[in-house]
Amino acid sequence: MEHLSRGMQQKVSLARALLTSPVLLLLDEPTTGLDPRSKLEVQDFIREVRTLHDATILLCTHDMVEAEMLAERVGILDRGELKFLEPVDEVKARFGVETLEEAFFAATGRSFEEETEEDRDREVMA
């Protein structure tokens, strides 16, 4: 598979996973590092899998827009703690926000600036 593009590798990996008709499909950052066209193709493939197969898909992503586009329900993990697992609209309503990114900051009690400072501190400690 090394001669395939990263996007094609992702699609082949997803297709291989479906050969066994799984009841649970775990996808960890399936579109990270892909060019825009490949990212859309993988997202379309995930939607197709949701539509055609009776499987639960657990999608881990840092891309809040992608999560909103692909998920029926979203959960936010903060330092290993699951803050909630709800439909996207309920998450936004719960925090009175318009985006999942805003919901993340509301759920974790941190602002963007604080998150950035903590990330820098972690980098220094590493």
Positions of the model-derived regions?
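Conserved catalytic motifs of ABC-family nucleotide-binding domains
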Residues: S21
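Catalytic Walker B motif of ABC-type/P-loop ATPase nucleotide-binding domains
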Residues: L25-D28
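Hydrophobic anchor residue at the start of the ABC signature
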Residues: L14
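Helical segment within the ABC ATPase nucleotide-binding domain
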Residues: L40-H53
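Helix N-cap at the start of a conserved alpha-helix in ABC-type nucleotide-binding domains
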Residues: P36-S38
